[in-house]
Regions:
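Conserved, well-structured functional cores that handle cations and Mg-NTP chemistry
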Residues: 1-181
Length: 181
């Protein structure tokens, strides 16, 4: 393992995420490093990539605790993430992509991403149980998307006016078109 790379990542995360405490930032760096090495986001796979940090079960448990830590201010961390991504790209007119993805019939994710070199960098998202009227966000699809986009826009410089792209199922709603004007 390239520990120097992990330490540089940890220092950069501490600098870019001032809302996180030192240990929270190190936990994020460890999770990111495991993700980068394994190119998978399953906690057990990430833990396999980090043997220098302890036994497999110890590292896996550490990652699980970090992910479920209620003391992490997710809203601030997302804002800081968006600002970091934006400062690294410097687009004049960014393209934001809105997409809803369902993972079988268990989980759905509504996500706003930044289109970059043929890829999408996730900026902000909301997860909920798929195919369940009770668990679907109460505000409905239009206000959910509007809220996610508003969160992204609040982190961008005031002069930036991004283009928004979404698939037909989301974009052809008259309520959506009114909300985005």
């Amino acid at each position: 393992m390239n520990l120097e790379g992990l330490y540089r990542l940890s220092a950069e995360i501490e600098r870019r995420f001032p809302s996180l405490g030192k240990w929270q930032a190190q936990g994020l760096a460890l999770a990111c490093w495991g993700l980068i090495i394994q190119q998978q986001c399953q906690i057990s796979r990430m833990a396999e990539a980090l043997p220098e940090w302890g036994a497999f079960n110890t590292v896996r448990q550490r990652l699980k605790r970090w992910i479920s830590n209620p003391r992490i201010d997710v809203t601030s961390a997302c804002y800081e993430w968006i600002a970091w991504v934006w400062s690294s790209c410097q687009f004049k007119r960014p393209l934001l992509v809105v997409d809803e993805t369902k993972l079988s019939d268990r989980l759905a994710v509504m996500m706003v991403s930044l289109a970059f070199e043929g890829r999408a960098i996730p900026l902000v998202w909301r997860c909920y149980y798929a195919n369940s009227a009770l668990d679907y966000p109460q505000q409905g699809q239009v206000l959910l998307i509007y809220g996610l986009l508003a969160h992204v826009l609040s982190a961008l410089p005031a002069a930036v006016r991004p283009l928004v792209q979404m698939d037909r199922g989301l974009a052809h709603s008259s309520a959506m078109l009114r909300a985005l004007k």
